[in-house]
Amino acid sequence: PLYDRTQRAGSPTLIKAILHRVDPPLYGHLQSLQLEWTPILLRWHRLLYMQEFTEATILELWDTLFAIDPTLQLVPYISAAILLSQRDKLVQSEYIDAMQFLMHLPDLNAPRQLVEHAMQLSQTPSASTGAFIARAYEQHPPPEPAESKMESAKHLLRELTAGILTQDGHGQSDWSPRR
């Protein structure tokens, strides 16, 4: 599991664990700033982002969240998605700027999309998911690790060879270099 189930769902430890897994460079930068996560997360989670966004945004966010997850297990993943949606600003920030920014976030354009991204993070907490979410908010994703590039190349090669080596009805390959 991504975190010890005994951890509180909104704890800084869980948010850091998610971020470490989905965007190690952003995680590293925020760690180097030694951010005070407790006041940020208290504000975000205790009031379910009510002080962060406009009333219309909150209503749409809550409607979507409660429809998908009435247990509120997605809340820490929503917070991680918020961080990814603001990645460019955060990686360029120093401590004071980052704290002020996180305490006064810009309004969301697509609250439903944020909840959907949080669900993706909870189901597949990986660097590729983090990069996908960052791109969805027009942020620059972190550089892809060399291993990941190799895995992408292997996957593409498997797809290409599967298309070439399709089987006919008798289990024989229908591919020939003479065709």
Put a short name on every predicted segment.
Residues 1-179:
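Helix-rich, well-folded core regions that mediate interactions or catalysis
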